[in-house]
Structures are given as structure tokens and as C-alpha cells.
């Protein structure tokens, strides 16, 4: 993902599912090189607190906007002008399809979506895969790395 961000010169990235901040740190390190920012959403307050500390320790807290709350509620609260050119999804698997539908109005014309655990949680994310497949705006591939990831490109 670090390479995607640098190659695409990403300016505004969104992470749905912060957890302890591990993925967000890698995203933020790449965004520091592009001059971009990361917005990251986590439901659990304790995880968000740990992530904030990890962002600070790793020196990326200046490019990270952590938001604690339900991803669907947070996404619904975004201003219509808030746009993202990269989205990483690694949260409640059954909600992936909802996240996809909710983020589409906030994507730039050439946005990239990366969704984790596509193979390991196939039954829970099948409706998401079907939605991406049915959407003519997106081309996608499923990469058979551990857990599996779906990479969808709008354009």
C-alpha cells in the first residue's frame, strides 16, 4: 500500500478500521512523502487511544486525523466536498458493502480502494465483491496474499 500511495501521489487517504494503528502508520509514512493526510476511523475507543500513541511514537501524528466512532455514522457525517483518492478497508467484514456505497460519493475520479481479508472472510464480504463487480466505474483484482486483498481502481 505504501507503494500505491507514492505512485499515485495520494493527497487524501481514508482508513476504515484503525485498530492499533499498524496499517495507518505505513499509510501515513507514505503520505508524509506525498504531502498527503490520512483520516482513520475506529469504533473502539481503547484501540483508537493505542493507535494515537503509536502514531505519535512513529512520528506520523501530524498527518493523521483519527476519528472514533461507528464507520457508517462517521462516513454519513462527511461533508459532500470531502474527497479521498485512496481508501483502505479493514473493519467489520459484513459492513464492507455499506462502506463501499457510502464512500463512492467521496472518491476522486481515479481513486483506489484496497479491502483486506477478502479470501479469509469470503462469506462475509461476498456482497461487497458482488457490488464492486457490478459497478462499471471500477476495475478490480483479488490478490491471493495471506487473507487476500481486493484492489479496485476507479477510472
Residue ranges of predicted features:
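S-adenosylmethionine/decaboxylated-SAM
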Residues: 2-155
